From Swiss-Prot:
UniProt note on tissues of expression: Highly expressed in kidney, spleen, adrenal gland, esophagus, duodenum, colon, bladder, ovary, cerebrum and cerebellum and to a lower extent in lung, liver, stomach, uterus and pancreas. Not expressed in heart.
Extra remark: Encoded by one of the numerous copies of postmeiotic segregation increased 2-like genes scattered in the q11-q22 region of the chromosome 7.
Official protein name in the record: Putative postmeiotic segregation increased 2-like protein 2
Coiled coil: none
InterPro entries: HATPase_C_sf (IPR036890), MutL/Mlh/Pms-like (IPR038973)
Source organism superkingdom: Eukaryota
Encoding gene, per UniProt annotation: PMS2P2
Family, as annotated: Belongs to the DNA mismatch repair MutL/HexB family.
Gene3D superfamilies: Histidine kinase-like ATPase, C-terminal domain (3.30.565.10)
Cysteine pairs bridged by disulfides in the record: none
GO biological process, one term: mismatch repair
């Protein structure tokens, strides 16, 4: 073929082009939900999209009718250091005091605890301590406990398909890792087969830095000191919010920790105690009137 018959090369725009096809297609249920929501919101899609993408807020881009153009000077792509990655990824897992408590209590329930004691020192700013009479941790599993303090290490699931059979509160393998990254974590445990308990101290990377014999009844106690101390700005915000809400703290805390809703526990004046009776209740409240209202309407 002659030179005149060759097609001219397609002009390439400056900068990289990122194409994403079939978003959520690997998660069938989520993919269907995504498609259903998009179809419902077609009329207001441009406005809702610009609102959610805050950098497009106020933009006249009527997506997907016309594309939006953003200009940003190119910067070199470099890896984030491991410590920063650990702290950044831990933030969305533990969002608040109540989230931290729910994660720890959930682990206690998964371990078969029927009695759980919760103690907060200085409204949880100084110390969160959760003790449960579960099965405890065998010494041969201490290394596994250390691994569970690394992200995505758990005893609950092995592969994605296991999610359809999950019967536990925790399964992602993020809770202990995130707590270690955001605070000082100590775990005291005693397995039913052990003669004496053990205290394990973790560093912010989730590794065991100290292991000592410790008298402890059967079960496990998780102590979290100085929550959010590794994130100075968030730590100050956390302290400020707690101080602002001291008057209504017990009620707000019990509301956020749904398993404490309706509890008379005036935290942190007195510790809360949870007991698993095995009784199925359709209503979280123990008051007859509220139970009838929730059940009947």
């Amino acid at each position: 073929m002659g030179e005149s018959s060759r097609k001219p090369p397609t002009p390439t725009p400056e900068g990289p082009t990122v194409s994403v096809k079939q978003l959520f297609s690997t998660l069938p249920v989520r993919h269907k939900e995504f498609q259903r929501n998009i179809k419902k919101k077609r009329a207001c899609f441009p406005f809702a999209f610009c609102r959610d993408c805050q950098f497009l807020e106020g933009s006249p881009a009527m997506l997907p009718v016309q594309p939006a153009k953003l200009t940003e000077p190119a910067k070199a792509i470099k890896p984030i250091d491991r410590k920063s990655v650990h702290q950044i990824c831990s933030g969305p897992v533990v969002l608040s005091l109540s989230t931290a408590v729910k994660k720890i209590v959930g682990n206690s329930l998964d371990a078969g605890a029927t009695n759980i004691d919760l103690k907060l020192k200085d409204y949880g700013m100084d110390l969160i301590e959760v003790s449960g009479n579960g099965c405890g941790v065998e010494e041969e599993n201490f290394e596994g406990l250390s691994l569970s303090a690394l992200k995505h290490h758990t005893s609950k699931i092995r592969e994605f398909a296991d999610l359809t059979r999950v019967e536990t509160f925790g399964f992602q393998g993020k809770a202990l890792s995130s707590l270690c990254a955001l605070s000082d974590v100590t775990i005291s445990t005693c397995h039913v087969s052990a003669k004496v308990g053990t205290r394990l101290v973790f560093d912010h990377d989730g590794k065991i830095i100290k292991k000592t014999p410790y008298p402890h009844p059967r079960g496990t106690t998780v102590s979290v000191k100085q929550l959010f101390s590794t994130l100075p700005v968030r730590h100050k915000e956390f302290q400020r919010n707690i101080k602002k809400k001291r008057a209504c703290f017990p009620f707000a805390f019990c509301r956020d920790c749904q398993f404490l809703e309706g509890s008379p526990a005036m935290l942190p004046v007195q510790p809360a105690k949870l007991t698993v009776t095995g009784e199925l209740r359709a209503c979280r409240s123990w008051k007859t009137r509220e139970g009838i209202t929730e059940a009947v309407g």
